[in-house]
Amino acid sequence: MNFKGKTATAIIELPNSNILLVKRATVPFKGYWALPGGRVDVGETVEQTVVREVKEETGLKVRIVRKIGDYHERGVQDGIEYEYYPACFLVKPVGGEIKKQEKEIQEIKIANLKEIPKRLAFEHASMIQDYIHSDNPAQRNSLD
């Protein structure tokens, strides 16, 4: 089975330098911590996708703050070849309550940026590092 396509990923910024992570319940990367996100549906923009996927996976309504970047992920994991082109966005919660989607998510965790798990899915560690090392100091200071 192969997976290929455009995806959208969210860094959900919470108070006190925390972000929200999800533990994947599906392959590839089953059991790995990840940023919420998923595949872009036909006729959908990446911005619409990130808002929809966060709501589906975590129960949170979010607003997009800014785009972190565009990425290319390619590899084989759990016997599955994948090639994704994710757009990563910084988002903030504006409503809803944290509630995991049973089908795709094993667990939801609030993680401090200083204590991010080493075992992350896809290129999510790079996305988090890009967020932490943002060129804009005002954006970095918005963590607190």
Residue ranges and their predicted role:
Residues 72-97, 131-132:
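Active-site-adjacent beta-strand/loop module that shapes the phosphate/pyrophosphate-binding cleft
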Residues 1-19, 86, 90:
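Conserved N-terminal beta-strand and adjoining loop/helix that marks the start
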Residues 18-56:
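Conserved Nudix-box catalytic region and its N-terminal flanking loop in Nudix hydrolases
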